[in-house]
Swiss-Prot record:
Principal subcellular localization: cytoplasm
Source superkingdom: Eukaryota
InterPro entries: RIMC1
Subunit structure of this chain's protein: Interacts with the MON1A-CCZ1B complex. Interacts with GDP-bound RAB7A and promotes its interaction with the MON1A-CCZ1B complex.
GO cellular component: cytosol; nucleoplasm
Protein name: RAB7A-interacting MON1-CCZ1 complex subunit 1
């Protein structure tokens, strides 16, 4: 166990050094101080100090959390730049790939070192959800930009399909980390609507956005990639909001999109009715799926 801990500490330290160098490059290119880069750099400096202590005494969970928070801030700065520039066609593909790689590193690190059979114990559900959300949301924004480029779609719809499948996979993964709260006499809630949301696996506004984003990506896949040969891209297609369902199957854009958007509309017009979440786009997509099926 001590050897495994020491290995993780060394690897986190190496990754932290690489990230710090990357932040330095970003800061120099930006020509001004940025809140997110400053915060990311501070987290990595703290990480460096902790890694300098006795490695056997280091808490890998704390180190990994610091590294993950730094990566989330660093990549957020770069994502904002991509969005502001509307994902430049000549460089965005490589940049998106690079950001996905950064955001995947914490999970990869834990899995490679087999620190715990349930690696979420090291990162925690909220950080795992955030990593999946950020990857899925990044691909959603990128695909949204690509769907407006008619010539690009004619040439590279197969590439769009790959981005969509990956993005949907990350968003469904995010929705499936936590199990819904089972309603019973031993659990008390302040109001019935909150109870309904938690029992549906809706723990935050981000969970709702993830449902809408994945449903919209399924729509793009069905609209722009329908003529392509199906791929054996297996995804956990359950949308219960829980990690309890672990079966995987090839993703069917229409089927998954219908399932998740029906739940989205039900939640928005049910327990969240007073908050006036917009369901117009979701209903239009469901209507598209209905006519496409018939």
């Amino acid at each position: 166990m001590a050897a495994a801990v020491s290995s993780v500490v060394r690897r986190v330290e190496e990754l932290g050094d690489l990230a710090q160098a990357h932040i330095q490059q970003l800061s120099e290119a930006a020509g001004e101080d940025d809140h997110f880069l400053i915060r990311a750099s501070a987290a990595l400096e703290k990480l460096k100090l902790l890694c300098g202590e006795e490695k056997e005494c280091s808490n890998p969970s704390n180190l990994l959390e610091l590294y993950t928070q730094a990566i989330l801030d660093m990549t957020y700065f770069e994502e904002n730049k991509l969005v502001d520039e509307d994902f430049p066609e000549d460089s965005s593909s490589q940049k998106v790939k690079e950001l996905i790689s950064f955001l995947s590193e914490p999970e990869i690190l834990v899995k490679e070192n087999n620190m715990h059979p349930k690696h979420c114990n090291l990162l925690g559900d909220e950080l795992l959800e955030c990593l999946s959300w950020r990857r899925g949301a990044l691909l959603y924004m990128y695909c949204h930009s690509l769907t407006k480029r008619r010539e690009w779609l004619l040439r590279k719809s197969s590439l769009l399909k790959k981005y969509l499948l990956d993005g949907i996979s990350y968003l469904l993964q995010m929705l499936n980390y936590r199990c819904p709260i089972q309603l019973n006499e031993g659990v008390s809630f302040q109001d019935l609507d909150t109870a309904k949301l938690l029992s549906a696996g809706i723990f935050s506004d981000i969970h709702l956005l993830a449902m809408m984003y994945s449903g919209e990506m399924c729509y793009w896949g069905s609209k722009y990639c329908a003529d392509q040969q199906p791929e054996n891209h297996e995804v956990d297609t359950s949308v219960s909001g829980a990690g309890c369902t672990t079966y995987k199957e090839p993703l069917d854009f229409r089927e998954v999109g219908e399932k998740i958007l029906k739940k989205y509309v039900s939640v928005c017009e049910g327990p969240l009715k007073e908050q006036e979440w917009n369901t117009t786009n979701a209903k239009q997509i469901l209507n598209f799926f209905h006519h496409r099926c018939n």
